[in-house]
Amino acid sequence: MTNIRKTHPLMKIVNSSFIDLPAPSNISSWWNFGSLLGICLIAQILTGLFLAMHYTSDTMTAFSSVTHICRDVNYGWLIRYLHANGASMFFICLFLHVGRGLYYGSYLYLETWNIGVLLLFAVMATAFMGYVLPWGQMSFWGATVITNLLSAIPYIGTNLVEWIWGGFSVDKATLTRFFAFHFILPFVVAALAGVHLLFLHETGSNNPSGLNSDTDKVPFHPYYTIKDILGVLIMITVLSSLVLFSPDMLGDPDNYIPANPLNTPPHIKPEWYFLFAYAILRSIPNKLGGVLALVLSILILMLIPFLHTAKQRSMMFRPMSQCMFWILVADLFTLTWIGGQPVEHPFVVIGQLASVIYFLMILLIMPITSMIENQLSKW
């Protein structure tokens, strides 16, 4: 008799995705981040659900309701900080996952890659709206500054901003709709992640060598289930250490001051995971130019498959490209640092240089480096 996991309509899907899935025998720990992102998403949806039970999306009570969660709800402080720092873990895993894709040429699976970029956009939108909900100073001013950027769109800009705000400034209507969107978007992300996996399983996973691995596959379970569980345990250790020892390390102290439209914080800045994009936005003195650069800094990922000039897929055997890749990583760290600094000399110039290097690396330097490597290896 055939095993039930291979015949039952629902279990068959689980079986072909997580149990009998043929996986390359040599995928490294860099391939763990997909499963970690899945765990992060589930954790965020669950903690978010419990927070939503006690949260009120009204400008008069939002800040107080978050205080109430932390003080009066059983383990409310734990749920709140797991949710806030869980977002940071989510983005750490996202950036490493994207970095892995860039390094090993996984972007050549076009559908999987493009849906991944859409996922990145959706998660960033969710995180932005979630940051507005506690209705602290940084929540309010962050929402004001970022939504205001849309006014740079010619002709419809001002109307668009007021439509999003639901009035003439960020107020009750804005908070209520942001809460609604923040609640629904993670489920959209979950659906997109399902499609992401669907397309991935059409081709199978890439591997560190970038070569076809059809001749050497192993079943996903038990090999990679065990490997993924180790990754999950490490992530839980890091997250719980962060939550239990220094829950506010990655947050902004200004967000413990209730939102006040009459008082602007000295330095308006987003959460750390948006700082690189924020630095690119600020490095251009023109409003529309800055907004375009901000969007392109992520959208440029969709161009990467078309900029692949190398004969080999992975960077594993391409030392010059490796060097360029790590310069790009260092540049992103620089941008993240600059995004958190005030707008003054020398930070402005460093930010502008780092922004130019970011776009030059991806659009010009890395494709040219690959061409040089092709010549050197006598292809």
UniProtKB/Swiss-Prot annotation:
GO terms for cellular component: mitochondrial inner membrane; respiratory chain complex III. It comes from the Eukaryota. It is a multi-pass membrane protein. A ubiquinone binds at residue 201. Binds 2 heme b groups non-covalently. It is found in: Mitochondrion inner membrane. The chain crosses the membrane at residues 33-53, 77-98, 113-133, 178-198, 226-246, 288-308, 320-340, 347-367. Pfam families: Cytochrom_B_C, Cytochrome_B. Keywords: Electron transport, Heme, Iron, Membrane, Metal-binding, Mitochondrion, Mitochondrion inner membrane, Respiratory chain, Transmembrane, Transmembrane helix, Transport, Ubiquinone. One of its GO terms (molecular function) is ubiquinol-cytochrome-c reductase activity. Heme 1 (or BL or b562) is low-potential and absorbs at about 562 nm, and heme 2 (or BH or b566) is high-potential and absorbs at about 566 nm. Component of the ubiquinol-cytochrome c reductase complex (complex III or cytochrome b-c1 complex) that is part of the mitochondrial respiratory chain. The b-c1 complex mediates electron transfer from ubiquinol to cytochrome c. Contributes to the generation of a proton gradient across the mitochondrial membrane that is then used for ATP synthesis. This is Cytochrome b. It comes from Crocidura orii. The lineage of its organism: Eukaryota, Metazoa, Chordata, Craniata, Vertebrata.
